[in-house]
Amino acid sequence: MQLPSFLDVYRGLISTSSISSSDPSWDQGNQAVIEKLSDWFAALGFDVDVTEVEPGKYNLLAQKGQGEGGLLLAGHSDTVPFDQGRWSFDPHQLTEKDNKFYGLGTADMKGFFAFIYEAAKRMDWKGQNKPLYVLATCDEETTMLGARHFSAHTPFKPDYCIIGEPTSLVPVRGHKGHVANVVRVTGKSGHSSDPSLGVNAIEIMHEVLFALMQLRDTLIKQYHNPGFAIPSPTLNLGHIHGGDSANRICGCCELHYDVRPLPGISLDGLDNLLRGALKEVEAKWPGRIEIVPLHEPIPGYECQHDHPFIHGIEELCGTPSQTVNYCTEAPFLQQLCPTLVLGPGSIDQAHQPDEFLAFDFIDPTIDVLSKAMRKYCF
């Protein structure tokens, strides 16, 4: 049987829609793309296991070789939604133009599996003494469901893991986490001509905002990591809405905010800080302040800076490792083994119209993956 080419696999990935979204009208399953990956890797001699994590949401684990340890190459099979009116190309068709591949998922990050496939296809597997694993997860773009499930249930522990998010082939050894909450203040509406008739939710929210800004200053003073370009946690007041008319006492006001904690800050500890910051306001206005998460929190992540794995991958890439501010599945896979983020394409193209991956990444990425397989599986 003739095996599909790198380009065949790349086209197949991009043409198979696998959008995940918190908006049910956009959210899709990823079964079709997982089935394609299953067929392709099985044809290369991998043992393939597909797990339905939730209805319509699947993880794939492909294994080549037996034994303990080995290398895990991981990525997510889903993409974000797209705005058709802002794309110059069909998002679900791989378009080649100006030495670039255009399409949804070319960089972030379904396309990475085509690189793994091609490197594995070219590899001479004689002498392999440790397994190679390929993990394709679901719902990274929303809840990190696939990575959370895999790290909690997998029966094995590889020696090392590489997640193929777009890093321009620069190894990433750490990133901040992400916590996003809603603060909902419930007041009591009434006619503005008599303030005593109601409780103004905007005025209570003013006190909430002051408390959160004080917390922001505390976080900056209390936590510092010089390995990050922005060395402290950030707290951003991102969205606020309250009231419906100038002549009504505001009955409800909502604030959306996020915090990006440094690695090492526990999510429980951060939650205690956030709730502690609002304790006095809540005591003053009992039953009127509610804190609700917008999504499950993601912890910060950092691979031990002097770990041999970092030095080994830096040597393969010829590039020093770095830290970044965006989030990946690394905090969850790091629970299993030392983990780095390394993949083709630029993060600047992620979640953007006309997402693309430059042809310049093709050969270097296949080369780095081939060398990593050889180094950690032989």
From Swiss-Prot:
Cofactor remark from the record: Binds 2 Zn(2+) or Co(2+) ions per subunit.
Binding site for Zn(2+) 1: H76, D108, E165
Catalytic activity: N(2)-acetyl-L-ornithine + H2O = L-ornithine + acetate
Highest rank taxon of the organism: Bacteria
Keywords from the UniProt entry: Amino-acid biosynthesis, Arginine biosynthesis, Cobalt, Cytoplasm, Hydrolase, Metal-binding, Zinc
Gene3D superfamilies: 3.30.70.360, Zn peptidases
Any Pfam family: M20_dimer
Molecular function GO labels: acetylornithine deacetylase activity; zinc ion binding
Membership in a protein family: Belongs to the peptidase M20A family. ArgE subfamily.
Subunit structure: Homodimer.
HAMAP family xrefs: ArgE
UniProt protein name: Acetylornithine deacetylase
